[in-house]
């Protein structure tokens, strides 16, 4: 997905002033759909086991159902590769470690590009394990739940952000195996989560001055490398690998601001659609070649669109509910973004009154509620892991 850096502002066609937005405050409590449980002494995102659909629907939540999660033993480990949609702490110098990130969970900035839990947390919760340790903390934290190598702003190839691309992330994983941090048995019972490509497209269009017309060739290059990456992760010993399809990048508030958050930009969504179709085909071919369903796709593209459509319908029926294309957190004017402060340390951003009803946290990343809604759309696919 697109990383928040200053160059990305070149994507904007126009931007109306946000000086009139109010800087609302909210308490540091998790919404009803997610409860931060204590696991081995630390707070962790665990799906609640109660059904509260009626009350939450009245509050504007997208979907809430009772969730049982995976029934396998706690021996399972989760290894994560990709960008900020799945990063839980590796981007130490980023906005993920600055307010208001983490306001909902755990109540302070903790390395997630959201107000709370992200996709990695929910998949770990499904597996009934703690979210895996970020790679930068590999020498000081528990390793029994796996490792998160994902880094905000990274891509399949190098991007405009100084961070490890996916090849380097897999290199780090391989080194841990060589150091016998994880055994063959560890890996055989484990799951990998792979999600990347949005930052590659942003870099291609911005740094390399590419155009949408040039996309088909670039997409082919990305898919070819992703195929190599997936093969490599499997060859290192992991037998179940979840692969995220590309989210509809034309629906990001960073772009929808051009239409006053009224509609997604279809030319950009077409990029995502083509990428996802090609990636799905590659995954199917790999599974056929291996003779078993090693790879499972997580359809972020259609999950995002489904949730957005549902929330837009409810917003049209009840304007007091939040427009899903509008971010919860945004800068007070064009030169600022979520988390910006001036030279005096004063906030130059505003927050929505109810983050628990939002879909996007800021211009690129989802809120905790947004990720929960997407997770529920993906839930049936997780049973294949």
Language-model region placement:
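Intrinsically disordered, low-complexity terminal segments enriched in Ser/Thr
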Residues: 16, 20-34
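Structural recognition of the beta-strand scaffold that forms the well-ordered cores
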Residues: 77-81, 86-87, 146-151, 190-195, ...
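Cleavable N-terminal signal peptides of Sec/SRP-targeted secreted and luminal proteins
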Residues: 1, 44, 48-68
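Extracytoplasmic, non-cytosolic globular domains
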Residues: 196-202, 207-308
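Conserved SGNH/GDSL esterase-like catalytic core that processes O-acyl groups on lipids
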Residues: 102-224, 228
